[in-house]
Amino acid sequence: MEKFKRINREKVYDGAILEFCKDEIITPEGKKVYWDFLQHKGAAAVIPVMSDGRIIMVRQWRNAIDKYTLEIPAGGKDSIDEPTLKCAARELEEETGYKSEKIEFLQTLAPAVAYSGEKIDVYVAFDLEKTHQHLDPDEYIDLEVYTVEELIEKILSNEI
């Protein structure tokens, strides 16, 4: 299969979290097309597993979808060069008030490949040690703890 070739990328908007770009592409047939693209510096997410096997989740407001969500702790990298393991450890403590010396890589997700280059490295944290939350001024997070079975029920009922 022949590749598409990007011949130009114009940065239309440079925000704090995202860059909005317009790419000029040549298709394998030689046709020139334009695609909008969101560039993201990357993120990390972490599944905090308590000593009894339950998982700490965060409930927070998500403006883009106008509702509260139940999710694992996650956040954007401070810079494009920040290692995602460092980001995951930071987000774990900031959002949950727990830290861990045993954080293991699980997988990389690309949640919106049709229009974004965002990648989220997912980790699992064990041997949690209680500290305290360090929320950003605009973050309002409630912690909720669930068994794996309870989370599966929430996924199957479209609550997550």
Model regions: which residues?
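Conserved Nudix-box catalytic region and its N-terminal flanking loop in Nudix hydrolases
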Residues: 35, 44-90
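Short, solvent-exposed loop/turn elements at beta->coil junctions and helix N-caps
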Residues: 9-11, 108-112
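A generic structural signal for well-ordered coil/turn residues at beta-strand boundaries
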Residues: 14, 19-21, 42, 116-119, ...
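Nudix hydrolase/Nudix homology domain
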Residues: 1-7, 31, 68, 114-115, ...
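Acidic, metal-coordinating catalytic segment for phosphate/diphosphate chemistry
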Residues: 9-45, 51
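Active-site-adjacent beta-strand/loop module that shapes the phosphate/pyrophosphate-binding cleft
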Residues: 21-29, 112-131, 144
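A short coil-to-beta-strand element that immediately follows conserved catalytic motifs
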Residues: 5, 99-106
